[in-house]
Amino acid sequence: MSKNILIVGASGLVGGEILKNLKTTNNDLILLSRKKLLCENSINQIVIDFENIDSLDASLKVDEIYIAIGQKLSLSELVYIKKNNRKSFVNVDYNYIKKVAEFAKNCGANSVGLISAIGANTKSFNTYLKVKGDIENEIKLMLSLIHISEPTRQAEI
């Protein structure tokens, strides 16, 4: 049976891989992104300013959601995010993710795949890891079937 799968962040490296893998299935794919992507006409694309997530049409049917969005950070920012950049980071990596998960839940989703980070922990003193832990916990309370991936950055040789 075909599912309606919402992919958030398909323009990024990990989200692009999720899209590539799901294209081989017999499911209906819906992309939620900031800009239109070059892909097959059979893939439904919703272009939105993530500040306006609440304006999305909740009559959309969604069975699963994959969330692979996040603020672009330098390697040093994984250790320390400057005070003046923290608000933007929290907005993308917590608020946007929470809102798209709520949207998907309101559209019928019961399954979520979330890209997070190794070491995510609500009690961490590291802003990056604390926010990742906070959103993981928020998502766990929201949907019944949760898959959290905590990939690591691979060094290029």
Region spans (language model):
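Structural motif
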Residues: 4, 63-64, 111
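Conserved Rossmann-fold NAD(P)-dependent oxidoreductase catalytic core, especially the SDR/UDP-sugar
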Residues: 8, 13, 35, 79-130, ...
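Glycine/Thr-rich phosphate-binding loops of Rossmann-like dinucleotide-binding domains
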Residues: 15, 39, 75-76, 122-123, ...
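NAD(P)H-binding glycine-rich loop region in Rossmannoid oxidoreductase-like domains
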Residues: 37-38, 43-106
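Conserved beta-strand positions in the Rossmann-like core of class I SAM-dependent methyltransferases
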Residues: 30
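N-terminal Rossmann NAD(P)H-binding glycine-rich loop of SDR-like oxidoreductase domains
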Residues: 5-25
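Single conserved hydrophobic/aromatic residue that forms the stacking wall/gate
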Residues: 146-157
